[in-house]
């Protein structure tokens, strides 16, 4: 059965620079390549990934009236994303991200939130019909927390599973933590929230146990090329990553989440399989440059 997924999150226009290495303070370096603008934002990336895995995907986001995101709206339509709840506002410009990728494929990202940061609980309430009919509601932290709380409250009241990707990393209020069914941090985000640095298998377990102890039912800690560690009250497992030559890690985590929620059963009885599917999809993403441009189609993932 096809999963119905609502993504609440950011839409950005990404500007990419390819560099041999990162500059030191006060240093000027030549850029290897300056690429044209691409669609991005954690929310948009996750929506694209979910839709390309052929889940029934609705996206709640906010963009400016500046027209710079019009090409992204076309990308959403091509991906068959329900754009009924995409809001245009004159309050701020469309969000932007400035991304540098070095020779090792690692990236740094600087984000201007723009219209994303004008998302309100009222905007979310206007999308209530989509939320209550979903299997999963997914959010990140590139929109205001009150809007996320509103979405998760609606979801929980109607038996919809909530998924939080706590990125960019920041402290979370208890009001939000109490509404999370599945949390998907990376090592840095997990450490910030739990206070436990992820250095080995035991610290991964300790980290996951922290989230379980505060009432979150399912914990996934993404570990980059080391794969994903997951835990529930009944089971835990380290799922290995697929070994590939990574050239750009941009959107790898977003691809993982989109693929994961597209495959996960509502009962979560296929948790390990859904995580492996997410790992497989993200292993394709890191072999290409760009964010949404690098997110694979379901047919490509199935060929791995």
From Swiss-Prot:
The active site is at residue 254. It catalyses: D-ribose + ATP = D-ribose 5-phosphate + ADP + H(+). Substrate binds at residues 12-14, 41-45, 142, 254. GO terms for cellular component: cytosol. GO terms for biological process: D-ribose catabolic process. It comes from the Bacteria. Its main location: cytoplasm. The keyword DNA-binding does not apply. Pathway: Carbohydrate metabolism; D-ribose degradation; D-ribose 5-phosphate from beta-D-ribopyranose: step 2/2. The keyword ATP-binding applies. It is found in: Cytoplasm. Requires a divalent cation, most likely magnesium in vivo, as an electrophilic catalyst to aid phosphoryl group transfer. It is the chelate of the metal and the nucleotide that is the actual substrate. Homodimer. This is Ribokinase. The gene is rbsK.
């Amino acid at each position: 059965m096809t999963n119905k997924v609502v993504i609440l999150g950011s839409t950005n226009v990404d500007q990419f620079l390819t560099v041999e290495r990162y500059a030191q303070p006060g240093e000027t370096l030549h850029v290897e390549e300056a690429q044209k603008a691409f669609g991005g934002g954690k929310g948009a990336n996750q929506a694209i990934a979910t839709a390309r895995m052929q889940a029934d995907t609705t996206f709640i986001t906010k963009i400016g009236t500046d027209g710079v995101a019009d090409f992204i709206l076309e990308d959403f339509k091509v991906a068959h994303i329900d754009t009924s709840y995409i809001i245009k506002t004159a309050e701020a410009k469309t969000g932007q991200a400035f991304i540098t990728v070095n020779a090792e494929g690692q990236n740094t990202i600087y984000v201007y939130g723009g219209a994303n940061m004008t998302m309100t609980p009222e905007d979310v309430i206007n999308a209530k019909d989509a939320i209550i009919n979903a299997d999963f509601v997914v959010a990140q932290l590139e929109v205001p927390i009150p809007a996320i709380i509103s979405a998760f409250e609606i979801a929980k009241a109607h038996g919809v599973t909530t998924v939080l990707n706590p990125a960019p990393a920041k402290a979370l209020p208890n009001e939000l933590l109490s509404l999370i069914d599945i949390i998907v941090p990376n090592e840095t985000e997990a450490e910030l929230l739990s206070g436990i640095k992820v250095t080995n298998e035991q610290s991964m377990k300790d980290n996951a146990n922290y989230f379980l102890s505060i009432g979150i039912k399912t914990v996934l800690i993404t570990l980059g090329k080391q794969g994903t560690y997951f835990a529930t009250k009944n089971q835990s497992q380290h799922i290995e990553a697929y070994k590939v030559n990574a050239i750009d890690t941009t959107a790898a985590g977003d691809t993982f989440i989109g693929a994961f929620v597209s495959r996960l059963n509502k009962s979560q009885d296929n948790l390990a399989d859904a995580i492996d599917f997410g790992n497989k999809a993200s292993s394709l993403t890191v072999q290409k440059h760009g964010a949404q441009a690098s997110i694979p189609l379901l047919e490509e993932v199935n060929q791995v």
